[in-house]
Amino acid sequence: MSGRLDFNFGSRVYPSWFVGTALGLLVGVAGCSKEATPIAPSSSPLGQEPAQALKLPGLSYWNERRAEGPWSIHVVKIDRSRQDLRLRTTIARNTVLGLSSLSQQIRNVPASAGKVVAAINGDFYVVDQSPYQGDPRGLQILAGEVVSSPGDQVAFWIDAAGEPHAEHVDSKMTVALPDGATFSIRVNEERGPRGIVLYTPRLGPSTRTVGGKEYVLDREGSGPWLPLEPAKTYTAKVMDIREGGNASLKGDHLILSAAPRVAGLNDVAVGSVVKISTATAPDLPGVQVAIGGGNIMVRGGKLQEFQMPSSGAYKYRSVLERHPRSAIGFNATHIFLVEVDGRQPDLSIGMTLRELGQYMRGLGCVEAMNFDGGGSSTLWVDGRVVNSPSNGGERDIGNALVIVRTPTTETK
């Protein structure tokens, strides 16, 4: 396709290559199971856990086959009462930028975090060969660290009290200058022509920007510092100012990067003290895990309606088309990871978002949202990929959500 199309997601404008489901690119070569077991018999009620489901402590998995699609649906059901099961996000290559398969991201989870027992692909991301390939579209918090700021969209997270949420999250992140002026900022993303972005060492070796001014920040005083956490204020001193972009990200320094068209920072000099706020709406104090996604499908136990698209662009029409899908849902007792295979007429044709929402509600979810789908849709359980990715193998993706088992004295 020639030229460049832009999709407008909230307050951000993203090129057509941004949506991982839009193009059949980046196909991995890892092995996948075409005939994952156990399989729920078609005579059982839709969404009901079969007697032969794979049982692990606190977790069950099954593959439900339905002739009426046909559909092949993979479900992981997690007991929320288990103190030894934790959710965690991953990123490719342990940096914001770059892509790797779900299996590779699982291998990169540190042993200290626990043993991964299940995982699913995560947010939409930059898929093309740009300097920011792999950048997640929305919010991501990894072990308490903000690695990507909200993109004015839906996210899933676990609050400090252990309660799951799936709802819209807005960025309220700012930098306050010595003269009192305040500017909105984003974290670890491509800088727009009038944007200000805060880059952390988690991005990669350098900011990859072109032009503008970049302010090297170091800790000032005894307040909080890296890793960057949500719902906090950081006091920083300007140690250096670099022209031209692509500043190195070294040690525990931050880089505040201003595009050439940004006005109002001319009085910021070496030695100036600025304040960085990582506020969001809703606020996320103490959150250890968060990941962005797509539409809310079930809210308060009610199926959400999806309007007929006013545009023929893929972003809009894909909502009403059948594609491979990935989703997360929950109720008072369980969290569900669901993957629906698609684009394989003899196995599974995929689902619309409404069909997926109906299925999630049938599982008992009172809240449910979808993740990136299409060729990205991948579910991993107990050491292997259990679904049949539509491209014939694992696609390299930007991030993922994993379930880890941690050491505990609990013996349930």
Which residues fall in each region the model found?
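N-terminal secretory signal peptides that target proteins for export/translocation
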Residues: 1-15
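Intrinsic disorder/low-complexity segments in short proteins, especially the signal peptide
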Residues: 10-12, 28-31
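Intrinsically disordered and other compositionally biased segments
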Residues: 12, 25, 98-101
